[in-house]
Amino acid sequence: MRQVTRIVALALFLLCVSGFTECYKPVTKTQLPKHIKTVAVPAFQNNALRFKIEHRFTEAVMNELIRRGHGLRVQSEREGADAVIDGVVKSFNFSGVLLDDKGRARIFEVTIVAAVTVRDQHENRVLYDNQNFVFRGEFEFANDPRNFFNEEDPAVQRMSRSFAESIVSTLVNGFGVKDDK
């Protein structure tokens, strides 16, 4: 009886393993080609007409690449780079989402839309393109004017770090699903 149970369990296991090999595609470990050792991050363009926002996003992407780029060299010039990360901050909006008892906006939501393209310089092809990165964050104004502290700048800093983490994760962990097995 015990041997029959083992044989049935083994047959069931083999059936499951062999029968479902086409039901998934493995996620890539990295889509970054092996020859890419240096990544250029030129200053992002600012179409949002918001002071220094492009600088914050560019700096955040460079810092995140240095921190998590697995030995990638990071530079700001395109010359000599194996890949280039181009970015455009398309829009910056904030709106009140919570009012105080006097009808004044107390908590604001910031929405930033950006476009990012990663290009292989050697093969002259686009590795990644997302023209609609959307990031949201919020900041709060204090009720008491003596404790007033504008949280808009820290909120933008947090969003730029989140943006950079997303971009670098995409580069380091892969762009999607492999077509071949």
Which role does the model predict for each range below?
Residues 45, 49-53, 57, 106-110, ...:
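Extracytoplasmic/periplasmic, Sec-exported soluble proteins
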Residues 33, 77-81:
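A short beta-turn/loop motif at secondary-structure boundaries
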Residues 68-72, 80-82, 86-128, 132, ...:
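Surface-exposed short loop/turn segments
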Residues 9-19:
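Bacterial N-terminal signal peptides
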Residues 148-181:
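Compositionally biased, intrinsically disordered linkers/stalks adjacent to structured regions
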Residues 1-9:
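Bacterial N-terminal signal peptides that target proteins for export
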Residues 20-70, 122, 172-181:
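A structural "domain/chain start" motif
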